[in-house]
Amino acid sequence: MTVQQRRRPPIASRETLQALLSEGAQALGVALSDAQRGALLDYVALLAKWNAVYNLTAIRDPRQMLIQHILDSLSIVPHLGAHGAAAAALDVGSGGGLPGVVLAIALPGWRVTLNDIVHKKSAFQNQAKAELKLGNLSVVTGRVETLRPGADVPAKFDVIVSRAFADLADFVTLARHLVAPGGSIWAMKGVRPDEEIGRLPDGARVKQMIRLTVPSLDAERHLIEVELDEAI
């Protein structure tokens, strides 16, 4: 056994991950069925399996994937509830499918579209869609600013969300043409992004800024909702 092997942390069992997921979801106030929990654990397994091929995340440990990716993504679910049980969401710069795949599992009545410019990441997203049997999930490859409602995507979206995609002002500028009436843009951030907020373009303003607490994660997390004049 090599030194590296001796130092490598043991891989958590599915039962351990399931307990961590159940406790975390309960702490977040997100109700999940057995099938939904199973799908989220299957998604973690897919991320771990295909990470070396698709370069999806710097995190290699499934336990940390569950905390830093799944629970982190689940933390926004209660705050998106105002859009109802049947909203349309676009996940911009989705990468390995975060938070969009998690939203599609946790909110089965929603129609979720994943967007990325990297074809191999879109390939993984389609793989996840097929293996997890997510009929409410779709994938579109290309720059968000070039997507046309009614052509590249079916229509405008009630929710446009990103997780560490870009500077907040850039995100709003690139995606605002895709926001449906009554919809808004949601940005998942680490530390409170006051400087980014100060650079928001005309006609865009922060509607709410929510400090998130993610179970088992000792790091700052904020969720910013931006409303637009043209979508009110």
UniProtKB/Swiss-Prot annotation:
Q: Which reaction does it catalyse?
A: guanosine(527) in 16S rRNA + S-adenosyl-L-methionine = N(7)-methylguanosine(527) in 16S rRNA + S-adenosyl-L-homocysteine
Q: Which Gene3D superfamilies match?
A: Vaccinia Virus protein VP39
Transferase: present as a keyword of the record?
yes
List the subcellular locations. Cytoplasm
GO cellular component terms given for this protein: cytosol
Q: What CDD domains does UniProt report for this protein, alphabetically?
A: AdoMet_MTases
Q: Which Pfam families match?
A: GidB
Q: Where does S-adenosyl-L-methionine bind?
A: G93, L98, V144, E145, R163
Please state what class of enzyme this protein is: transferase
MF terms in GO: rRNA (guanine-N7-)-methyltransferase activity
Q: Which EC numbers characterise this protein's activity in its record?
A: 2.1.1.170
Identify the keywords attached in UniProt to this record, alphabetized: Cytoplasm, Methyltransferase, rRNA processing, S-adenosyl-L-methionine, Transferase
Tell me the InterPro entries matching this sequence: rRNA_ssu_MeTfrase_G, SAM-dependent_MTases_sf
Q: Which family does it belong to?
A: Belongs to the methyltransferase superfamily. RNA methyltransferase RsmG family.
Task of the protein:
Specifically methylates the N7 position of guanine in position 527 of 16S rRNA.
Q: Which PANTHER family match?
A: S-ADENOSYL-L-METHIONINE-DEPENDENT METHYLTRANSFERASES SUPERFAMILY PROTEIN
* Protein name (record): Ribosomal RNA small subunit methyltransferase G
Gene symbol of the encoding locus: rsmG
